[in-house]
């Protein structure tokens, strides 16, 4: 992947051969010679440690090598030197959102860069980079569950480039997450009409078929996605009813003692998938891919309900198909069942999503 960088002339006073040496760094990167890219960029930085182009290439190579902490530190150095460099800003945001995307704080930092870059792109009239910032913003907002806001960004992106498959795909995912299933179905089918080998479109059409109860179509779609990108879509781990129930029972037994006493009045159930009414009973709707849900009043609120008696007993539901699809191995599935039980028990205890995220139970 090439960094989001255009050829430009350094604004710093630098040796006359800087541009030629930067071209050599770029060539090394384009040929996949990442260590050579680092070596050449570091040699330039030894002579001019605030050369933004060299910092950009260095950060890009580090990101490709998976050395993300170093990449982000280097992007930070570069942005201090060139705070209004849109391509640099976009590359840093892409690293935060697309590469460190399982870290909510990183995604939010990336979204802040997207917002700034979007405004600067509008001001300068750079519609190409404006599209990229809007697309990345939509991806990041989907990742943190802000799917309605993601739709706004993605619709704006598609105004600039209506046929962009990546933006259309991300928009369709937002529709799915917002439980607008008929619109999502149409959107994914239209994407496949233009790009028949788009694996995520097949995967989501499989999820939609599964929700409709069309097991044959779901298997066909999941199979197509797996055939296209097997490492991205491994077959789900299936425990079977008895083994799954045992894993849930073990997870409850592992709860801290001071929590177990509250579980006596909680119904714990396992269902294949969340029902539409359960998802759309919240505003915004819950994700169709949720692993579990807590229903009822938290312990902290029960004392105010009829003198402590809650006429609507609390319940926790785990969704087996979503959990099995989430995990890559049997061990990972059993671990995730435990985490999900703890997550929903956290809601029982009155913790919100931010509290749970801070405790690593998101």
Which positions does each model-derived feature cover?
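Active-site scaffold of zinc-dependent metalloenzymes
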Residues: 288-338, 348-362
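TPR alpha-solenoid repeat register
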Residues: 54, 88, 126-127, 133, ...
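Alpha-helical segment of the N-proximal tetratricopeptide repeat
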Residues: 14-53, 57-64, 91-105, 136-143
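TPR/TPR-like (Sel1-like) alpha-helical repeat modules
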Residues: 112-119, 193-203, 207-234
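Canonical positions in the second alpha-helix
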Residues: 43-44, 77-78, 116-117, 123, ...
């Amino acid at each position: 992947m090439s960094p989001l960088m255009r050829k430009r002339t350094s604004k710093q006073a630098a040796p006359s051969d800087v541009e030629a040496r930067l071209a050599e760094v770029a060539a090394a990167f384009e040929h996949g010679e990442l260590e050579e890219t680092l070596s050449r960029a570091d040699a330039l930085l030894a002579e001019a440690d605030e050369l933004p182009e060299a910092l950009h290439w260095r950060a890009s190579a580090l990101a490709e090598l998976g050395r993300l902490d170093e990449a982000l530190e280097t992007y930070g150095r570069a942005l201090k030197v060139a705070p209004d460099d849109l391509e640099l800003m976009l590359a840093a945001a892409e690293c935060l959102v697309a590469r460190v995307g399982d870290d909510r704080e990183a995604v939010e930092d990336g979204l802040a860069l997207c917002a700034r870059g979007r405004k600067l792109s509008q001001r300068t009239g750079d519609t190409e980079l404006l599209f990229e910032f809007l697309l990345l913003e939509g991806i990041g907002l989907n990742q943190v569950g802000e799917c309605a806001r993601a739709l706004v960004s993605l619709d704006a992106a598609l105004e600039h480039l209506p046929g962009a498959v990546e933006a259309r795909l991300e928009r369709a995912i937002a529709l799915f997450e917002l439980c607008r299933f008929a619109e999502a179905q149409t959107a994914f089918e239209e994407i496949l009409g233009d790009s028949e080998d788009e694996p995520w479109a097949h995967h989501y059409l499989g999820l939609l078929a599964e929700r409709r109860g069309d097991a044959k179509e779901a298997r066909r779609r999941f199979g197509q996605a797996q055939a296209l990108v097997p490492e991205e879509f491994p077959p789900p781990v299936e425990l079977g009813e008895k083994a799954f129930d045992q894993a849930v029972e073990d997870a409850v037994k592992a709860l801290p003692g001071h929590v177990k006493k509250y579980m006596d009045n909680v119904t714990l159930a396992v269902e294949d998938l969340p029902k539409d009414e359960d998802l759309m009973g919240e505003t915004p709707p819950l994700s169709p891919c949720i692993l579990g849900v807590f229903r009822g009043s938290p312990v902290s609120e029960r004392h105010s309900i009829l003198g402590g008696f809650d006429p609507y007993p609390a319940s926790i539901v785990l969704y087996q198909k979503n959990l099995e699809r989430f995990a890559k191995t049997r061990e990972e599935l059993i671990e995730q069942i435990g985490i999900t039980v703890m997550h929903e028990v956290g809601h029982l205890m009155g913790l919100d999503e931010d509290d749970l995220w801070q405790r690593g139970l998101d």
